[in-house]
């Protein structure tokens, strides 16, 4: 069931988290600029319902939720709900008539991928994390092409390593700047996601105070929604408010990365790829409750390259953070080398690579 018009069409399935949605948006924008018609498949309850229309793309919704870790009755009902969702996705495909379907993670990808296969439409999968999610793991057996961001992601499935699509502004930043080796205050960017990271919020005021006794340090700390007053108060209580910027959320990550010497953060796939692209050293604390502990394997990409330190949250304390920051503040040459080594593993043309695979399959069809 191919599109008989000259205009090529792609149905993109991605949702749930920014780690799925933002890379998919990068591909959507790239193909749209090449005169492709782009449509989205997602769920009405997750972030794609808001973000995708904001970026100018039409979105269709199906009814589907995750089943991992839920109760017995829900698991028993899951096959029937999946069947219903597959039929919903198939109706979207029959109406839109895409030349290719791209799955980039999230609940909608499962039913949408099955519907694509049943409809005879080429299915491309892209896995952002170093350990594949359950949906992509299952769909990889029926996909026309499997893509991944990191080496050795899939077992016994031939997958092409293409990197993670990221915003072109960050790629440009990495190409236009070098790691700052000037012996001035160590600039530490602390990012814990939109909700913040409690462990960072609890530790960093005291860590900053301790490091400031031996080295010059400034901090830009994203604390997450609802945490601004308490964390700012902790810095003020220690007399550190003059050298710290505290924000609930950082809207301009390009400016934040450009400012920073080192980043303290989680190890989401998109974060790891962005750090590599901009060439920033990092201290990575993987989210300990991530499914299959995939953030630890994401982090290893930068750690093994020598571009990051890994501090599992189970052993994280103030002394370890103080030690790492003091090392970096004392040895700016090593800081620069870490940034260079991080940049060595960057794949800056991931958007084009994903799009090119979709274009190739659409032309074959």
Swiss-Prot record:
Q: Which residues form a coiled coil?
A: none
Keyword Transmembrane in the entry? The reply is: no
Q: What biological processes does GO assign it?
A: carbohydrate metabolic process; cell division; cell wall organization; lipid glycosylation; peptidoglycan biosynthetic process; regulation of cell shape
Give the main location: membrane
| NCBIfam families named in the record | murG
* Biological function: Cell wall formation. Catalyzes the transfer of a GlcNAc subunit on undecaprenyl-pyrophosphoryl-MurNAc-pentapeptide (lipid intermediate I) to form undecaprenyl-pyrophosphoryl-MurNAc-(pentapeptide)GlcNAc (lipid intermediate II).
Name recorded for this polypeptide: UDP-N-acetylglucosamine--N-acetylmuramyl-(pentapeptide) pyrophosphoryl-undecaprenol N-acetylglucosamine transferase
Species: Shewanella violacea (strain JCM 10179 / CIP 106290 / LMG 19151 / DSS12)
């Amino acid at each position: 069931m191919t599109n008989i018009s000259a205009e090529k069409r792609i149905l993109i399935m991605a949702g749930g988290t920014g780690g799925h949605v933002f890379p998919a948006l990068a591909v959507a924008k790239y193909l749209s600029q090449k005169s492709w018609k782009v449509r989205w498949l997602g769920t009405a309850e997750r972030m794609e319902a808001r973000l995708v229309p904001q970026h100018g793309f039409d979105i269709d919704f199906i009814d589907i939720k995750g089943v991992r870790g839920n109760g017995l009755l829900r698991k028993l009902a899951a096959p029937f709900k999946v069947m219903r969702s597959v039929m919903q996705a198939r109706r979207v495909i029959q109406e839109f008539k895409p030349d290719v379907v791209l799955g980039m993670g999230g609940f909608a990808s499962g039913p949408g991928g099955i519907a694509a296969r049943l409809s005879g439409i080429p299915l491309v999968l892209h896995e952002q994390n170093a350990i594949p999610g359950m949906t992509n793991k299952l769909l990889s057996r029926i996909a026309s092409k499997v893509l991944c961001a990191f080496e050795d992601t899939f077992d016994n499935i031939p997958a092409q390593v293409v990197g993670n699509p990221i915003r072109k502004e960050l790629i440009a930043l990495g190409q236009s700047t070098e790691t700052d080796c000037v012996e001035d205050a160590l600039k530490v960017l602390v990012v814990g996601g939109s909700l913040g990271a409690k462990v960072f919020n609890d530790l960093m005021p005291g860590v900053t105070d301790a490091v400031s006794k031996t080295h010059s340090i400034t901090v830009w700390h994203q604390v997450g929604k609802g945490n601004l007053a308490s964390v700012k108060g902790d810095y003020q209580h220690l007399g550190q408010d003059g050298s710290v910027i505290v924000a609930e959320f950082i809207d301009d990550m390009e400016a934040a990365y450009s400012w920073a010497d080192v980043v303290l953060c989680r190890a989401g796939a998109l974060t790891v790829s962005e750090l590599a692209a901009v060439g920033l050293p990092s201290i990575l604390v993987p989210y300990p409750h991530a499914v299959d502990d995939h953030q630890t394997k994401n982090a290893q990409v930068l750690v093994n390259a020598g571009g990051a330190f890994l501090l599992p949250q189970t052993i994280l304390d103030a002394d370890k953070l103080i030690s790492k920051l003091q090392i970096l503040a004392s040895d700016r040459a090593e800081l620069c080398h870490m940034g260079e080594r991080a940049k060595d593993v960057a794949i800056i043309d991931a958007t084009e690579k994903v799009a090119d695979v979709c274009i190739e399959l659409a032309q074959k069809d």
